[in-house]
């Protein structure tokens, strides 16, 4: 399942991933969304 990532608001790695996701979305959809901040983040643990 999914679990919360503690300290996500202060994580440079998570912020960089979010900025990348917004940039990629804007390229594919010809949109002009702007990244503002990370509110929360979750991770998924997959076994196997």
UniProtKB/Swiss-Prot annotation:
Protein name as it appears in the record: Cystatin
CDD domains noted in UniProt: CY (cd00042)
Gene Ontology terms, MF aspect: cysteine-type endopeptidase inhibitor activity
Transmembrane parts of this sequence: none
Family statement drawn from the similarity comment of this UniProt entry: Belongs to the cystatin family. Phytocystatin subfamily.
Nucleus in keyword set: no
Motif (Secondary area of contact): 44-48
Keywords: Protease inhibitor, Thiol protease inhibitor
Known function: Inhibits papain and cathepsin B (very poorly).
Keyword Nuclease: no
Database matches in InterPro entries: Cystatin (IPR027214), Cystatin_dom (IPR000010), Cystatin_sf (IPR046350)
A UniProt-annotated Pfam family: Cystatin
